[in-house]
Amino acid sequence: RGIEYRREPVEYLDVMFDGKPLPAMFSKAPGDGPKPCILHFDGLDLMKEIIYAAVADEFRRRGISLLIVDHPGVGGALRLHNITSGPDPERPAAACIDYLETRADVDPNRIGIMALSLGGYYAPRAAAFEKRLKCCVAWGAIFDYGVAAADRLTGKGGEPSVPAYAEHLHWVFGTKTQDELL
């Protein structure tokens, strides 16, 4: 609601992925013509509205549009559509790029990806397999989530970021046992 009250230039939309909607926000860079665009994926316990509040103005000031997506395992994709995270973040990234390529206000030759925390693993993997991505920013990457999750579950990894951490991980990844999760 705060975005509505501030009258910010954002468009709420769904990007279709495997026949299901990934909730997203598109923040258009000012000016005419196609602009570069960053696709933003979240971490384990974030959602698009938090990222929008943190970075959208900075991208707009630099003439870069931003597509922030609740990708599989995150935010509305998980809570509203039960889309769990999989081992192949390049697939939802490809769906997002397919969508961006339909927009006249996006330069299809200047699409990049950025993500933080667990998303810092997703973004490089997506960029490695999805050749249409021209840049990649891994913001606080977790390169082996199995080790990080095991440490947190056994109390060695610091405080969990969400209550009922083990249950949250099972929900995000669609697993039932710790062996499946790790």
Model-predicted segments: where are they?
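Gly/Ala-rich beta-loop-alpha elbow adjacent to hydrolase catalytic centers
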Residues: A115-G119, A123
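Conserved alpha/beta-hydrolase
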Residues: F59-G76
